[in-house]
Design a protein with these regions (language model features):
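Targeting-peptide/extracellular-domain and disordered-appendage signature
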Residues: 1-141
Length: 141
């Protein structure tokens, strides 16, 4: 992979669906649009993931909402990073979401959400903060 910093604000993909400028950015400069992807819906993979770490308490939580075309995956993990490391993860899979989760096109703002009878999870990205909410019934029972 090239070590190239992308600094110009531009669309992520060209008209043919290929990357306009491969590389990395220090800020969000590449603009994503699901409509620009030239692949079948079942091959489009979108996700939102957060890892929240408390160094003071040696614990962490990881939260994922993903729409991977042919499969959806929602998971929550609790990690104890202390003297006796331990983790527990619960995952819900769904067949063929194919864009129905309507994940935001930008990490700057928007709401990512998933809800069913066992899990209510949403990530709210606002102007000055992000709110991560997770109500996972019977988590680790």
């Amino acid at each position: 992979m090239r070590n190239h910093e992308v600094t110009k604000v531009q669309k992520l993909l060209k008209e043919d669906g290929s990357l306009r400028e491969p590389g990395w950015s220090k800020q969000l400069v590449q603009q994503y649009s699901r409509d620009d992807i030239k692949a079948p819906k079942f091959r489009i993979k979108e996700w939102d993931y957060y890892l929240v770490v408390s160094e003071e308490h040696d614990i962490a939580g990881a939260f994922t909402i993903s729409d991977d075309g042919y499969i959806g995956l929602q998971s929550a993990s609790f990690l104890d990073l202390g003297e006796t490391p331990w983790e527990h993860t619960e995952t819900i899979l769904n067949a063929f979401p194919m864009g129905k989760l309507k994940l935001p096109t930008s990490s700057v703002s928007g709401v990512t959400k998933y809800q069913d009878k066992r899990l209510d999870m949403h990530f709210d990205a606002g102007k000055d903060k992000r709110v991560i909410f997770c109500d996972y019934k019977n988590f680790h029972e």
